[in-house]
Amino acid sequence: MSRACELTGKTVQYGNNVSHANNKTRRRFLPNLCNVTLISEVLQQSYRLRVSASALRSVEHRGGLDSFLVRADDKELSQRARLLKRQIVKKKAEQAA
C-alpha cells in the first residue's frame, strides 16, 4: 500500500531538518493518511478509501464524495477513484434521462 492519498494524490515529500548551527539532515514529510469509509449517495454504497486529512475536509466542504469526485481532476485521482467517478457520472446521467 503506497503512502499516497487516493483523492488528491498527495504523497511523501523530502526535505531537510535544519539545526541552529545550520546543519542539514535529510528527512521525509509523510502525508496524514486516514482509512475512512465514505458513502456515495448516487450509488447508495459505501467505499473504504485511504485519504489525507485535508482531502477529507475538502470532501465535506464540497458536499460529499459524489460532488467531490465529479469536480476533481482525473490526473489527481487514483485508479480506483477514477473508476468510482465514472460510475457516479454514468448513474447521474441515467437518472437525469
Swiss-Prot record:
One Pfam family recorded for the sequence: Ribosomal_L28
Keyword Phosphoprotein on entry: no
Gene3D superfamilies: Ribosomal protein L28/L24
GO CC entries: cytosolic large ribosomal subunit
Record keywords: Ribonucleoprotein, Ribosomal protein
MF terms (GO), sorted A to Z: structural constituent of ribosome
GO biological-process terms attached to the record: translation
Keyword Ribosomal protein among UniProt keywords: yes
Family named by the database record: Belongs to the bacterial ribosomal protein bL28 family.
Name of the protein this chain belongs to: Large ribosomal subunit protein bL28
Source organism: Bartonella quintana (strain Toulouse)
